[in-house]
Swiss-Prot record:
Protein name: Cell number regulator 1
Tissue distribution of the protein: Expressed in roots, coleoptiles, stalks and silks. Detected in leaves, apical meristems, immature ears and pericarps. Highest expression in coleoptiles and silks.
UniProtKB keywords: Membrane, Transmembrane, Transmembrane helix
Transmembrane portions of the chain: 91-113
InterPro entries: PLAC_motif_containing
Organism this protein belongs to: Zea mays (Maize)
A family per Pfam: PLAC8
Region Disordered: start-end pairs: 13-44
Amino acid sequence: MYPSAPPDAYNKFSAGAPPTAPPPPAAYHQQQQQHGANMDTSRPGGGLRKWSTGLFHCMDDPGNCLITCLCPCVTFGQVADIVDKGTCPCIASGLVYGLICASTGMGCLYSCLYRSKLRAEYDLDEGECPDILVHCCCEHLALCQEYRELKNRGFDLGIGWEANMDRQRRGVAGGGAVMGAPPAIPLGMIR
């Protein structure tokens, strides 16, 4: 149906040398380290992950938005408790944040450290603005975003780190279901 091409037709368009295969992943990772790249290219998918919600999506959780607007130290304490893996309780972190805000008005300098820790823990992309700018310009929005990120990752920020870990242990021990007392079986009409 179609005319056949002459045998040398392909050769006149080729560059001459066959293309080389890309280096294997291990060699590529070593090359990146030699050039000073700070991204881990050996991770599947490579690159950083996006936040589960945007910075301005605070109305995705209106309750948290209201609490953060009225008393940001509560949201900060909840986020810090999870990010620090329970080493500093929610009340202590919130109190320190509140004191820094009240005495200097620069709580954003303290809270941006926790945003950086959260991003490092979950390989989250920093975006166009550094953490310090996000917290200094949009403190309440940043706290709400961090809260939603942890919530979307399965944490219940209202119960703290220890209770979340206990809940996770019970869930794993029960094959995915939370173990508890067996359900009561109604006996019906028995004589």
